[in-house]
Amino acid sequence: TRNYPYSNMFSHVVGYDTNGKSGLESEANFTLLTSHSFFLTQMKNQFLNEKNTGDTVVSTLNANLQSIAYNALGDRRGAVVVMEPSTGKRLVEVSKPDFDPNTIGDNWDYLVNDENDSSLLNRATNGAYPPGSTFKVVTALDYFRKKGTFEGYNYLCEGSITLQDHTIHCYHNTVHGQENFYSAFANSCNCAFADIGVGLGGASLRETAENLLFNKSLPLNSYRTSSFSLDADSVTPLIMQTAIGQGNTLVSPMHMALITCAIANDGVLMKPYLIDEVVNDNGDSVKKTEPVAYKRLMSSNEANLLGKLMKQVVDSGTASALSGRSYTVAGKTGSAEFDEEGHSHSWFIGYSNVDDPDLVVAVIVENGGSGSEAAVPIAGQIFDAYHAS
């Protein structure tokens, strides 16, 4: 019989082993059933007709950071992903609404049929959300690949832009005035990035998005493929929307965390992993996971330039609440509209210790408003806790 001492806190990432398996329970099932006990112990058990003790899995999860993230998200729906960009270690994975794995057998029928909360859905890996302005890292990368520089771009933001009878507004109709590329990114200017997107075109944006694993498989056991619909035939209004993270694009928080990990790790995405080590019943190490590179998503120079853009977001832009700390942060906020009334999910992606990145955080708060309102304070609590330890 399983006992989950943390109850709901790790419910999705650790998973369950009743009514099928999910999460780490599924990934580590064979390992937990396998025994590397000392051979004399196995002979003794065979003689006594007793079972050998299965191996123990040591996860990469950080219980303290998980608790901080879990409590910071509170009663709101959403997800938090925290990773170590240089290794691929998955340190935190929170998804809410959640469930108690200790009582999942008793509550199974209710949980399976609960379409309102979808508590069994791991929003961190399998949630599908419009990325909002976090997608501007993709648009920015495509611009750099096409132009070779961010210098020389100038735009006069008047609070809205209309092309082919389609109008896009900046958040709260803010008029940003004269901007270069860096200030447009820091201000999260929708008008400038809609203008940039139209200049790039659907085919170019699609190529760069797919380089960053949109419409592609991810190096995970369980995930939802992120979708990106632009192509060479896409109409201008859809390109405008897509370039600012709206349109038909859908992405998981984990996928945005992986893109951020690549930016923080000189362009290389390390293969994410949950199992740090396997030990036998005597505590001897059976297998230790060694970090391995999964794929280079961008050049070192491209990653460095995106990092500079994201640093400016914290220094003088929409994530300025994270500035002035004992450590540095680079990030991007997002407000992803999801209905006709203009309600939006609150996004943040970013990393700390900019010169030698140590921690990547991705946060989404459903119906949380702007990124700076809900997601940034959660990320701040996680960064603070990590750097205080």
Briefly describe each language-model feature range:
Residues 285-292, 378-389:
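Short, gly/Ser/Thr-rich active-site loops of penicillin-recognizing serine hydrolases
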Residues 22, 358, 370-372:
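Intrinsically disordered, low-complexity acidic/polar segments
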Residues 33, 74, 311-315, 384, ...:
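Short, intrinsically disordered, mixed-charge
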Residues 86-133, 138-367:
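Beta-lactam-recognizing serine transpeptidase/beta-lactamase-like catalytic domain environment
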Residues 1-79, 93-123, 128, 293, ...:
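Extracytoplasmic/periplasmic proteins that interact with beta-lactams or build/remodel peptidoglycan
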Residues 80-85:
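Short hydrophobic alpha-helical segments used for membrane anchoring or interfacial signaling
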Residues 256, 371-380:
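Short, charged, low-complexity patches
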